[in-house]
């Protein structure tokens, strides 16, 4: 997993609340068994049926910092929703509230989910409306987002923050213990099952 310390990208104002995982990526796209190729499914119902949807505009189609309304990622637990956001190019999503499971899935995959006050979300929406294509800089170490002269703090679970800054997914966490695993396996009797030949 790629380390996350700072990221600068175009902010995308998703001025909708209660965006559930079925809206993020409909179930029809969940048939793949790989973790890539989901960008076409991201918000597909809105992108296909609303020509004015934010991701259909030239200004925001390459955005990488999503500023969403409250209760983002609710509904069923779909890692595919996180994968779709990341495949599209998003590195961070900010909202005043996230579903716990979505937030956990995001942290494990490398997508930052930062919690801001709703008034700060609305301030960012206003700034992006005034300056379409506004670049936002996310500093995970300091837990701030900078938009021009405006600096806004955000919250993130300390454990997820550490994992993102270290670039550690579940496999990476396990590999940190590789010496201990190999030592344990070397001491196991030969008649017991082994993980290596």
Swiss-Prot record:
Reactions catalysed: (2R,3S)-3-isopropylmalate = (2S)-2-isopropylmalate
Pfam family, one: Aconitase_C
Keywords of this entry: Amino-acid biosynthesis, Branched-chain amino acid biosynthesis, Leucine biosynthesis, Lyase
Molecular function (Gene Ontology), one example: 3-isopropylmalate dehydratase activity
Top enzyme class: lyase
GO cellular component terms attached to this protein's record: 3-isopropylmalate dehydratase complex
Quaternary data: Heterodimer of LeuC and LeuD.
HAMAP family assigned: LeuD_type1 (MF_01031)
Stated role: Catalyzes the isomerization between 2-isopropylmalate and 3-isopropylmalate, via the formation of 2-isopropylmaleate.
Protein name: 3-isopropylmalate dehydratase small subunit
Taxonomic classification: Bacteria, Bacillati, Actinomycetota, Actinomycetes, Mycobacteriales
């Amino acid at each position: 997993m790629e380390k996350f310390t700072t990221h600068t990208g175009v902010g995308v104002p998703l001025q909708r609340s209660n965006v559930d995982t079925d809206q993020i990526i409909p179930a029809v796209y969940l048939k793949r068994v790989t973790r890539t190729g989901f960008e076409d499914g991201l918000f597909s119902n809105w992108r296909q049926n609303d020509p004015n949807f934010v991701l259909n505009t030239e200004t925001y189609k390459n955005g990488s910092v999503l500023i969403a309304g409250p209760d983002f990622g609710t509904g069923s637990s779909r890692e595919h929703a996180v994968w779709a956001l990341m495949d599209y190019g998003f590195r961070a999503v900010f909202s005043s509230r996230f579903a716990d499971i979505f937030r956990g899935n995001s942290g494990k995959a490398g997508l930052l989910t930062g919690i801001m006050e709703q008034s700060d979300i609305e301030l960012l929406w206003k700034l992006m409306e005034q300056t379409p294509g506004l670049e936002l800089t996310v500093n995970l170490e300091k837990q701030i987002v900078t938009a021009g002269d405006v600096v806004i703090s955000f919250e993130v679970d300390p454990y997820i923050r550490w994992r993102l800054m270290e670039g550690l997914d579940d496999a990476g966490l396990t590999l940190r213990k590789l010496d201990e695993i190999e030592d344990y396996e070397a001491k196991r009797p030969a008649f017991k099952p082994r993980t290596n030949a």
